[in-house]
Each structure stands twice: as C-alpha cells, then as structure tokens.
C-alpha cells in the first residue's frame, strides 16, 4: 500500500503557522515511507476565498521547503461538487441519511435547551428533498466508534451520544464533514494528520467512511498550538501568519526547525537540529498530545542562532532585500545610490552576530550610508550629559592626531581621552557612539569608525559638538 497523506488548507487568509507545522509533519511522514503528499485547497467558502490567498499558500509551502512540483496537486475541493452530491444521494438511498425540516428554534422548544443537540425528530417522517430541508446522517443507536490514532491511542465515542448531524444543506450543497470525507476517498488518502481541534469531528467522519463502504484512514491528531496564556493561537489576537515572519526576516530553516519542535523533540538534549536529521528522526508516535506553546521569543532566539551560523557570503545575500529596499518591512532610509556593497561587506561579520531577524540589519548599519546619522533623541539625552562637550573636543583632537586610522588606534586614543576625564572606556565612548551612529548600542564602535573613515567620523563629532553648550 502506498502511503498517501494530504494537507488541506482553506484560502481564506494568511497562512497560519499551525498549518505550516501540519504540512511539514505530513510531508516528512510521506517522505519517510516513500509515499505521496497531496495538496488540496478547500475553496468552497466562496464569500471568503481569494486567489491571492491560494497563491500565498503555495508560496509559503515553497518557503518552508515543500516546493511546487514535488507534490500531487493542488486540487480544489470545489471541483468535486458532483462527487459530494453523489455520496449524499447514496447515503439517502441506502437509508443512512434522511431529510429534516427542523429549525434550531423548533429543536430548542422540544428539548428545552439550546445546548442539547438534535433530538432525531425527523428520523421516521420519511421526508423528501425540498426547501428548508437539510440531509442528516442517521447515527447508529448502539455501539461505539473507535478512532485509531497514532498519537492518542484509541479514543472511543459512544454512538448514542453522537447526534444525527447534517451532511448536506437544503440546496444540496455538502457541509465540510461530507466533502472532506469524499475528497479523501477520491484521492486515496491512507493517513490523515491534522490538528487536535478536528478530533471531535473524527467519529462522525469515520461513520461516513464506513457508511460509504470504504475503510477509514489511520488518524493522527497533533496537539493544538497555543500562546503564552495557553489559548489557541488566533489570527485576530496573535501573530500567526507565516508570511509575517518571513517578511520580518526569519530564515526558513529556523522556522521549520522550530515548528517541528511543537509537540516533538529530537534525540539528545539539542533543539537546533539539521533538517535531514529531523526528517530521519521524526515519529508521529512520539508526538506529545498536550498543547504546544508557540514561544515567539524562543523562535527569535532560534533565528539568531541560524543567522550566526550562516557563511558570511550567505548572510550578505540574505540581507539584500532589506539593503536594497525590496523587502516589505524596514525599508532603508538611504537612496539606492548611497548604498555601497563593499562597505556593507566590511561590517557584515560584525552585524551578523548582533541581529536576531534580518530586518534589523537596516538599523544596525544605516549610519554608514547616510550623510548624517539618524539621532535617537532618547539616546542623545542619556549620552550627552555634563562634560560630554569637553570629551568630544578631546576626542576630535585625539582622532585628528593619530597617524593611522584603524580600530586599534581609535580605541587607544579614546581610552587616553577617557583617562584624562576620569572615565573608563565604556563611559567615554557613549557620547562618541551617539554622535557617530545616532544610537547607544550597535556594531562594535571602533571597527565601525574604521569603516566609516576619519573624515566622516570627525565631521559627525563636530556636528554633535555644535549642539552642546
């Protein structure tokens, strides 16, 4: 038997990080078994679907390593409407479904509760199709439905507690439960790996599989992804769009490494693991069924580690969208003709150790490509206290006099200036750093001065001095 898994997102918004994790888990599971990964776009919500969301899904999958052309599809659920209707008719003709004209208000009036569920009122009324009549599945009165789940064992659901659920609306269109099952049957899906939130629907879907005469797939319900308050990640409340992380400058390798750790751990005590090792070691049976915390701070730290591990040439290439202004986040304040690739290459190894996401590169190097630094007034107020003017005067004199302009020489000169003013180097360099770079923190100061050059450094020190009494 060829293993066939599917990833079935809906094109109704940005691509959710939880969906990305499910896609990767399906992808690895199929790859380990020489199987097939099927992409099915569940596009039946015409009011919310947009072509750009579908393209966003394809682009996001490609970014995390699931390239176009390496999987089967994409198929579109809307293309299978005829199959959905045929399945609904089979269930009705076989006595496994019946028409119902009950409104919610009528059910509530009979049961006395808005939460009691459907009471089976129309089971034996022998209604035919018509306006206001939905098609309901006839759930068995006895027995239990056992779901074989690779992560959760064998959850068992008493059939008498499963209400007769709707499988087709009064206009004949199928609901999600039926369409999903029919599509999986049509595509020969053998394993369904998806989020825990779908588990309550699983006994209903398994009953549909059995009623249609097909062996159900093997199920695997991975833990739901939650925020720091243990709430399910929400598009309205949390930062969940994979594209947002990509655009901010997270690396794909860091992102997919982190996503795979949501509910699973590799061997040993390591967490940053080469992708081939993850592909080899991952086992669905080892996934923890408890909720998985999406820790953005930890992801950020992961990304910083991945950035620092890049060869410098790859780091320089990765920064290009932000340096050239083609990125959508953190546009550079300089004009294209002001950017100098050689200058950036000189400081790239210094910047590489100080950023956690690529978009931070602009704020770290902007002072190198502007005529004047962008002064952070808060940093200015803290650095330019009493005595700062005298210290800048002394630094200008010292920097003018040194015979060679390099990091070691400028450091020695400023150390001497600081000693004359009773200051250690850390205190002495604060006014100089703000005057030259505009910020209190950033790249190593003296290496930055070397790249900036003597004349530009002195020009900025003099400009800062003019602002002081």
From Swiss-Prot:
ATP binds at residue 235. Monomer. This is Glutamate--tRNA ligase. It comes from Salinispora arenicola (strain CNS-205). A motif ('HIGH' region) lies at residues 9-19. It catalyses: tRNA(Glu) + L-glutamate + ATP = L-glutamyl-tRNA(Glu) + AMP + diphosphate. One of its GO terms (cellular component) is cytosol. GO terms for biological process: glutamyl-tRNA aminoacylation. GO terms for molecular function: ATP binding; glutamate-tRNA ligase activity; tRNA binding; zinc ion binding. Binds 1 zinc ion per subunit. A motif ('KMSKS' region) lies at residues 232-236. The keyword Ligase applies. InterPro entries: aa-tRNA-synth_I_cd-bd, aa-tRNA-synth_I_codon-bd_sub2, aa-tRNA-synth_I_CS, aa_tRNA-synth_I_cd-bd_sf, Glu-tRNA-ligase_bac/mito, Glu-tRNA-synth_I_codon-bd_sub1, Glu/Gln-tRNA-synth, Glu/Gln-tRNA-synth_Ib_cat-dom.
């Amino acid at each position: 038997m060829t293993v066939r898994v599917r990833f079935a997102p809906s094109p109704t918004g940005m691509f959710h990080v939880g969906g990305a994790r499910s896609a990767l888990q399906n992808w690895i599971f199929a790859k380990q078994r020489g199987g097939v990964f099927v992409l099915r776009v569940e596009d039946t919500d015409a009011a919310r679907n947009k072509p750009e969301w579908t393209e966003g899904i394809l682009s996001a999958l490609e970014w995390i390593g699931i390239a176009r052309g390496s999987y089967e599809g994409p198929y579109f659920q809307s293309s299978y409407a005829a199959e959905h209707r045929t399945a609904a008719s089979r269930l009705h003709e076989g006595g496994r479904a019946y028409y119902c004209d009950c409104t919610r208000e009528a059910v509530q009036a009979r049961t006395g509760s808005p939460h009691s569920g459907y009471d089976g009122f129309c089971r034996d009324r022998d209604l035919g199709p018509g306006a206001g009549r939905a098609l309901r599945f006839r759930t068995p009165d006895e027995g239990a439905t056992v779901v074989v789940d690779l992560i959760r064992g064998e959850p068992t659901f008493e059939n008498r507690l499963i209400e007769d659920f709707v499988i087709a609306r009064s206009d004949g269109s199928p609901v999600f439960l039926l369409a999903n099952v029919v599509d999986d049957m049509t595509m020969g899906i053998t394993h369904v790996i998806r989020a825990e939130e779908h588990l309550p629907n699983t006994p209903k879907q398994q009953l549909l599989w059995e009623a249609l005469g097909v062996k159900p797939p093997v199920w695997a319900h991975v833990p739901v992804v939650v925020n720091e308050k243990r709430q399910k990640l929400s598009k309205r409340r949390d930062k969940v769009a994979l594209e947002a992380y990509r655009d901010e400058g997270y690396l794909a390798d860091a992102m997919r490494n982190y996503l795979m750790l949501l509910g699973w751990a590799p061997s040993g005590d390591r967490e940053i693991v080469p992708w081939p090792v993850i592909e080899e070691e991952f086992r669905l049976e080892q996934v923890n069924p408890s909720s998985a915390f999406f820790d953005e701070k930890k992801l950020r730290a992961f990304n910083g580690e991945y950035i620092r591990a890049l060869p410098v040439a790859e780091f320089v290439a990765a920064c290009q969208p932000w340096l050239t202004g083609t990125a959508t986040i953190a546009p550079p304040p300089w004009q294209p003709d002001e950017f100098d690739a050689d200058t950036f290459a000189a400081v790239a190894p210094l910047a590489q150790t100080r950023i956690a996401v690529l978009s931070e590169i602009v704020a770290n190097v902007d002072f190198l490509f502007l005529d004047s630094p962008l002064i952070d007034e808060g940093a200015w107020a803290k650095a330019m206290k009493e005595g700062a003017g005298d210290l800048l005067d002394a630094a200008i004199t010292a920097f003018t006099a040194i015979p060679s302009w390099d990091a070691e020489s400028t450091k020695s000169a400023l150390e001497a200036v600081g000693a004359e003013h009773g200051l250690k180097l850390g205190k002495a360099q604060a006014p100089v750093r703000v005057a030259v770079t505009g910020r209190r923190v950033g790249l190593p100061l003296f290496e930055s001065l070397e790249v900036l050059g003597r004349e530009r450094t002195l020009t900025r020190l003099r400009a800062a001095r003019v602002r002081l009494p």
